[in-house]
Amino acid sequence: MANKLDTTTRAMILNLLVEGSSMRSISRVTGVSINTVTKLLVDAGNACLDFHDATVRGLKSKRVECDEIWSFCYAKEKNADDAKMPTFAGDVWTWTSICADSKLICNWFVGGRDAEFANRFMLDLADRLDNRVQLTTDGHKPYLQAVENAFGNEIDFAQLVKLYGSAPGGKGAQGKYSPAECTGIKKKARVGNPDEAKVSTSYAERQNLTMRMSMRRFTRLTNAFSKKFDNHCHVLALYFVHYNFCRQHKSLGGISPAMEAGISNELLDMKFVVGLIDTNAPKPNRPKTYKKRAK
């Protein structure tokens, strides 16, 4: 018989991973080895990646917002030259798209912040949408060519450009961690005929906050950052399945975004994710015949 944790314990660990707990704190609280927690994260990440990719398609969204959120892996970019770093160490950006009506995360992508990653992100988004949408992004320049490559003229695309002043508190210690003050915005139509009243990135930015609160490795000014790029992606895959399919949203009347978007008929839970893990697990390679024990 396989030596593995029961379903309830595994579901609890997965819930803790998307409720702001670090992996070592989960190990301490549950009394489970850190290696077991790590393996469970890897298995869950792989299962959730396949499930999300196969399920979140044919979307009938009308308004979509996109944004990028910063994190880092192994070391910050400014320390990259001073450390013997593995591949993908340094700044890591997570690109996300969210349906403004159902709050569903349509797709996500992890990598750099340049034109190559913007293009791959937008091509994937276009492949998941079933109709023409109004798309809003921030003023990041790579979006311009990426949207054109992915959608052509079959989209109503606008950018919301924020204007910033100086950080409160000046350049001293008081203003070191304070964001610059937003002094205004400009709405710029790029493709098609976007409705200016609906040009917004508020839901995408609010979802960024949810990510920072839900995943410990996204919390600023801690040592809980990702040490390995693969595990960074695994926890994101788990988080987005939880956010879309398992989490009750008060703004939606207590149902999940997937239910609101019409791609799920019920509210799922982490035991469902455990079931995905077990389904994806390879069958034990037991011998078909056994030698008789010598007398």
Regions found by a protein language model. Name each.
Residues M1-K295:
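Residue-level recognition of single "structural anchor" positions
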